[in-house]
């Protein structure tokens, strides 16, 4: 999923990756795709683990596709002067953002909805962002062709079964 892509792109960019995942199986998958560390957030708060791994400094950037409680925990182990990027709500709960933590730590929250750049929003800005998106996609395809991005395919569906596949 998007977490695997985030791990692999982070490694390409030279980051030390601490993956927080929801199962032991996902811990193994995260490590197989390049995570330096993996913590199962279902086993309890992961703040202490992240702080231990970072020598008490906290994470320098956080990418969160889960939301809810995971986002709240992430804010508690983020370093000052960095960004946290919520990209979804896979956990089912939309995160609430406590402004006091943002203020005290000088943290920036940066949302990302890729659909905005592809015309899937109220305002169609495809033409404006087309050169940037083409450049980004060309870079991603080059990484894929070089074997640096390795999507995890667990099942293949016919195009006619698109809605069934998306429900999984």
Residue ranges and their predicted role:
Residues 21, 69-146:
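Glycine-rich phosphate-binding loop and adjacent beta-alpha segment
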Residues 141, 146-156, 163-168:
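C-terminal capping/lid region of NAD(P)-dependent oxidoreductase domains
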């Amino acid at each position: 999923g998007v977490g695997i892509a985030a791990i692999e792109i982070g490694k390409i960019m030279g980051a030390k990756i601490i993956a927080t995942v929801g199962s032991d199986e996902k811990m193994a998958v995260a490590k197989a795709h390049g995570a330096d560390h993996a913590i199962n957030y279902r086993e309890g708060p992961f703040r202490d683990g992240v702080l231990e791994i970072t020598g008490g400094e906290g994470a320098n950037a956080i990418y969160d596709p889960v939301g809810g409680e995971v986002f709240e925990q992430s804010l508690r182990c983020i370093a000052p002067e960095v960004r946290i990027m919520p990209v979804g709500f896979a956990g089912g709960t939309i995160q609430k953002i406590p402004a006091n933590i943002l203020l005290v730590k000088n943290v920036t929250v940066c949302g990302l909805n890729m659909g905005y750049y592809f015309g899937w929003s109220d305002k169609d800005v495809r033409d404006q962002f087309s050169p940037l998106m083409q450049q980004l996609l060309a870079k991603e395809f080059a990484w894929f062709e070089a074997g640096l991005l390795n999507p995890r395919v667990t099942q293949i569906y016919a195009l006619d079964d698109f809605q069934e596949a998306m429900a999984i």
